Design a protein with these regions (language model features):
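Conserved SAM-binding loop
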Residues: 6, 33
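Acidic catalytic/metal-coordinating carboxylates
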Residues: 36-39, 62-65
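Active-site residues of response regulator receiver
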Residues: 8, 55
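Receiver (REC) domain active-site loop signature in two-component systems and cognate sites
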Residues: 58
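Active-site beta3 strand of CheY-like receiver
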Residues: 4, 47-53
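Two-component/phosphorelay signaling modules centered on CheY-like receiver
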Residues: 11-32
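Conserved phosphotransfer cores of two-component systems
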Residues: 45-47, 69-76
């Protein structure tokens, strides 16, 4: 099963995505949610994921900056 991390500063968005997207149909499982980029970056250091779905506009570090840091800090 593919491991999915959802990142959004609005709780209702991450909860809504879990309901609206048929993750199980595509052999995916939401393993964690994060409400900011820093929390997501800390999570992936010890917990590998296959897919990150993120909001672009978040306070502090935005989603694009977060993805760039993930790419630079992870081997694959």
């Amino acid at each position: 099963m593919y491991r999915v991390l959802l990142v959004d500063d609005e709780y209702m968005i991450t909860e809504g995505l879990k309901v609206l997207i048929p993750f199980e149909k595509w052999n995916m499982q939401v393993v964690a949610t994060a409400n900011d980029a820093e929390t997501a970056l800390a999570y992936i250091k010890d917990n590998p994921v296959d897919l990150v779905i993120t909001d672009v506009n978040m306070p502090g570090m935005n989603g694009l900056q977060m993805i760039e840091q993930m790419k630079n800090s992870l081997p694959n």
